Amino acid sequence: PGNSIDTDVIIPARYLKLVTFDRMGEFPFYDERFNSDGTQKEHPFNEPRYQGANILFVNKDFGIGSSREHAPQALMRWGIKAIVGESYASIFEGNCLLMGIPAVKTSKESIGSLMEILNTNPETEFTLDLDSKTISYSYPQNGGKRVVGIDIPEPYRRALTEGTWDSTRMLYANMDKVRQTAERLQQIRGF
């Protein structure tokens, strides 16, 4: 937790040299998680109770800084499938969308409540519903359910729910049209 977590913290610069993103999931928050001798520091990603979690709860201005694409790649390859926070750097938010990761927003108070529930009851299962723009969970003690409203720009929500976030897949699915357009463009004809 904390405000203004930049992409250099999410994925240290030395891991940008990897030729592919395949191993990127080993390194999110690496310098926050490990000492220079390789021993573990106290960090939520190192805690057994959070292993396998796929929703990341963050505070304000998450993903600021250089906005490197490697940051959401590292989180996705760690297993994060959605991020819920107060606010994001716009480029980071867009990079998340391009990988199919919803980066949704909610109030500071709601984030605080969600983090508190997670901290005291790490077994709590959260459900993110982009159609209803909610995140819900049940209280483990009594089975009571709580629903929290989220915000996501409508074009992002539609892209994620309709599967149009993946521009590469869309290009391949429309390859005939791509080729027709390429033939009309003299500057790329023959490539």
Map each language-model feature to its residues:
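Fe-S-dependent hydro-lyases/dehydratases of central metabolism
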Residues: P1-F191
